[in-house]
Regions:
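Membrane-interface junctions at transmembrane-helix termini in multi-pass inner-membrane proteins
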Residues: 91, 101-124
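Residue-level signature of transmembrane alpha-helical cores of multipass secondary-active transporters
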Residues: 27, 66, 94-97, 121, ...
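Membrane-interface helix-capping segments at transmembrane helix termini in multi-pass transporters
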Residues: 11-22, 48-60, 71-102, 142-149
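Interfacial/gating helices of multi-pass transporter permease domains
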Residues: 4-29, 146-147, 186-190, 194, ...
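Interhelical loop/hinge segments that connect adjacent transmembrane helices in multipass membrane
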Residues: 119, 146-153, 162-205, 220
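Single conserved hydrophobic/aromatic residue that forms the stacking wall/gate
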Residues: 239-251
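Hydrophobic alpha-helical transmembrane segments
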Residues: 91, 98, 122-170, 190, ...
Length: 251
């Protein structure tokens, strides 16, 4: 409600569309690098949260698996930069937005949800979003600041993941890890089972932007993004506002 009207006025439809088009492509790469790991990892961490040794081992194994998949993801980013003409129009922006893949890998949001440390997650999210909004108003002043807007798009959502990763030292114990006993790929098969559901959801949410970007241009994606946000905001307001029946019942 606050940032999008400002950003759309500065970036215009083609600037907003360019960022959203690239983000949609990267979201598919990120989908494959995550491979259902976040939802799977929440369950696995929750099962052993009272056992520091097992929790440390499982967390490190999942992080190693995610690191390997992230490496494959950046190989895909390199191939796209070399072969896709529409991405080659602004490779620096595409590479900047691809930082989403890295931040997702180190985010460990699943760990804090598994141990039910929701207070930290809420406070961290509020602080990071507040800082990112302030930086948006300070740094994005003209259409030429599209890289700053791209940085805001990444940091506003995933910047707090750096703090997540650093804070892991509070819970994980190096002396409990035997690296020879780690089996990161043992988590691959169960995570894939969740991956199929994530693919269906992602296709529904992101495919329109990708297809529109390839079939038309960034400006078309920008107008479509604005229309979608207006629709989502309207639906949210309708569902959160009290109905006449609820108002009558309360009286």
């Amino acid at each position: 409600l606050i940032t999008f009207p400002y950003a759309s006025r500065i970036m215009m439809a083609d600037g907003i569309g360019q960022v959203n088009f690239f983000q949609s492509i990267i979201s598919y790469i990120s989908l494959f690098t995550c491979l259902g790991i976040p939802m799977y990892a929440i369950r696995e961490v929750a099962k052993v949260r009272d056992n520091p040794e097992k929790m440390t081992r499982i967390t490190v194994e999942i992080l190693l698996l995610h690191a390997f998949l992230t490496l494959l993801g950046y190989m895909a980013v390199a191939v796209i930069c070399l072969t896709v003409t529409k991405v080659q129009t602004d490779i620096p922006l595409f590479l900047l937005l691809s930082a989403t893949i890295f931040f997702t890998a180190i985010g460990c949001e699943w760990f804090y949800q598994g141990i039910e440390d929701f207070k930290y997650v809420a406070i961290r999210g509020m602080v990071v979003k507040t800082i990112s909004v302030i930086l948006l108003f300070l740094l994005v002043k003209s259409k030429e600041d599209i890289l700053w807007y791209g940085a805001y798009s990444v940091l506003g959502v995933l910047g707090g993941n750096i703090f997540n990763f650093v804070r892991l030292r509070k819970y994980l114990h190096k002396d409990m890890i035997e690296f020879r006993a780690l089996h990161p790929f043992s988590h691959l098969k169960p995570a894939i089972h969740i991956f199929a559901f994530n693919v269906i959801v992602s296709i529904y949410l992101q495919l329109n932007n990708v297809l529109l970007g390839f079939m038309k241009d960034a400006e078309a994606v920008g107008y479509f993004t604005a229309a979608t946000k207006i629709l989502v905001i309207t639906i949210c307001l309708l569902y959160t506002s009290p109905s006449p029946r609820d108002y009558a019942a309360s009286r």
